[in-house]
Each structure stands twice: as structure tokens, then as C-alpha cells.
Amino acid sequence: MSKKAFKFNKTLLCVLILAAALLLAGCGGAKSTRAKADETVHTALFDFTCGQASTLEGFGSLEIPEGNKLVQFHMTVTNTSDETYEIFKDDFQMQWGDGDDDFGIAMYPLTTDMFPIETELAPGDSVEGDMMVYVPTDAATLTVAYQEVLGNGNDGNNFFVDLSL
């Protein structure tokens, strides 16, 4: 091999190694995690578990809107960090399709058995309760979504728990 060809191959190899290193460095971004009912999801600050979903025929004096069904599931959140944090029921988005309007939040708690609006959790403490949401009658899956927000305001990892209806 000539000196010129050797230098070219050496330069090409260096460029390829640099490109591979840059590609691998870009792979450290946010990730998505999917789970199913009764599986514990581990975020940076807490663990959460969503129980099996069930469809309710009614609840107290609530009237179920035409074309919808009332879905309930039990949720537990445990602070696994070393600091106290507030947990909000609205931190968890409910999704039931791919459309722009196929999402919502759980209902305002109507009883003490329901997940509270907000709770301050010390390290190791847990909060639990039932979440209820109206979804279209034809929805077959309810997905509970949580998006981490980093200290700099950027989105971190996201987590999805798929519940069969």
C-alpha cells in the first residue's frame, strides 16, 4: 500500500471513529418506558403502580355522559428520593387514543378513597387512591402517562402504563 493510500485510510478511519463517537454520545437522551397494570414503574424520584382498570356502571350521583364509560383504577406512588416532593393527581395524564383530543386527567376526588389532588411525600412515604376518568365507550385501552421534567425545565424520561378496558 502506498503512503498516500495509507494516509487516506488512516484519515478515513479517524473520521469514522469520530462519527461513531458522536452518534453514541447522542444516544444518552430521554427514554420511554412502557408497563402494564400491576407493574411498578421506577422514575428518578418515585415509583408508581397502576392496578387493573374496571368499568363502573355508576358512582354515587354521577351521570355518565352519552358515548362514554366510567373507568376506575387504583394507583400507588412512593417517594424513592432523599427529599420531600409534592405529587399531584394531574401529573398523570390519561390517554385513550391517537387523536389530538384523546386525553384527559382523572376526576376531582369525590371520596377519601380517591387519589388526592396533591400530597406532600417525604422520603419513603406513599400515597394511594382510586383514579376515575370518562373515556369513549369504544376505547379498549387506557394509558396512564407521566413525563419527567428536569431541573432545567427540559423534558426528561416519559413513562406509560397500558391498562386494558
Where do the model's predicted regions map?
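Conserved functional micro-motifs across diverse proteins
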Residues: G26-L165
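Sec-dependent N-terminal signal peptides of Gram-positive bacterial secreted proteins and lipoproteins
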Residues: S2, F6-A30
